[in-house]
Amino acid sequence: LCSLCNQVFADDLTSATDWPDAGHGAIPSTAIYHIGVGEIFLIAGQSNASGVGKTPGFDPPHPLVHLCRNSLTWTTAAHPTNDATDTAHPENADFYLPGTSPYLRFGTTMCRALGCPIGLIAVSKGDTYLGQWLPESDETQAQYPLPDCYPAGSLWRVVEMAVAAVGGRIAGVAWYQGENDADDDAMCTAYAERFARFVGHVRTLCRDSALPFFTVQINKATDGRTTDVHCGMMREAQRQAAHRIPRVFVVPAHDLPMSDAVHNN
């Protein structure tokens, strides 16, 4: 896990009988924290992945679940998971007050299920389109232009940085996105196909054709910007993606309470 801090920890520990006698003087030592032999998951998507829940709940840290924050430092995973303090990649910095995220519980659940330490890498960003997560070179980008303040491919570069920092391999992607694309008829209709392309790009990047994606259907929207029809279209696209793309899984969120017009609580 410590490769994200630009450190590689490798040593050959001999038996204690070969160590210097402590009576001969001080022995130099180094303490290296947050090392685990386990699995690393990438957290990507928009604000409901970043975490904006406002009601406190019992969701304590777990000693075997760690988080690589936006500052590229490892800590015991705790809310808020997408804190932008000292971020190393400002492209995904969220500068609003963060709240609780579903992915601390995801980490503890994976830890119990797999029986090993879990590392989470936070790269999500609120108010983003799928086109920002696709590579700028993806051939569908020209068909679905984004507003000027949402540069195509901007979040894909963050994904590349995060994957490279852990040696190019991760165990899976936790993905929660789609609210922005649901505002646009064409993007909503094309979402399943374009998401399949995103999955393919990430799997190619990680050299793992079976890399799992754990996705969440969007909840409803009550801000007047996105209609119930569009939300339903997006949820159906996300359901279809999980049926059509191998090792893409989906869970619903439309039964969750909300903290405001678009965010889960």
Residue ranges and their predicted role:
Residues 1-265:
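Cell-envelope and extracellular/periplasmic
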